[in-house]
Regions:
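Local sequence-structure signature of Cys/Sec-based thiol-disulfide redox active-site neighborhoods
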Residues: 1-25
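Non-catalytic, surface beta->alpha helical segment in thiol-disulfide oxidoreductase systems
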Residues: 54-81
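Thiol-based oxidoreductase modules, predominantly thioredoxin-like and allied folds used
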Residues: 23-37
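Short alpha-helical
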Residues: 8-9, 35, 60
Length: 82
């Protein structure tokens, strides 16, 4: 997950992952590593954080992550049995 320290949507994404029992999130802080922002934009086509991947699948930002959860599609992506 590409993120910054001051991003409320990044914090929401982390809370949602935590609530799902995800304990390991690879965080790439583009505020601390500005050169990684270009990488993020190239990979995602977006400029905003968070940009979230689950394995090799680009999810998008927090809104897309939350929509997957509401639709019941996040748990299978995380390998959580229904």
């Amino acid at each position: 997950m590409y993120s910054t320290a001051a991003c409320p949507y990044c914090q929401r994404a982390e809370r949602l992952f935590s609530a799902k029992g995800v304990s390991s999130i690879e965080r790439i802080r583009v505020d601390l590593q500005p050169e990684r922002r270009g990488e993020m934009m190239e990979k995602s086509g977006r400029r905003t954080v968070p940009q979230i991947w689950i394995d090799d699948r680009h999810i998008g930002g927090y809104d897309e992550l939350a929509a997957l959860d509401r639709a019941g599609k996040l748990d299978p992506l995380l390998g959580i049995a229904a």
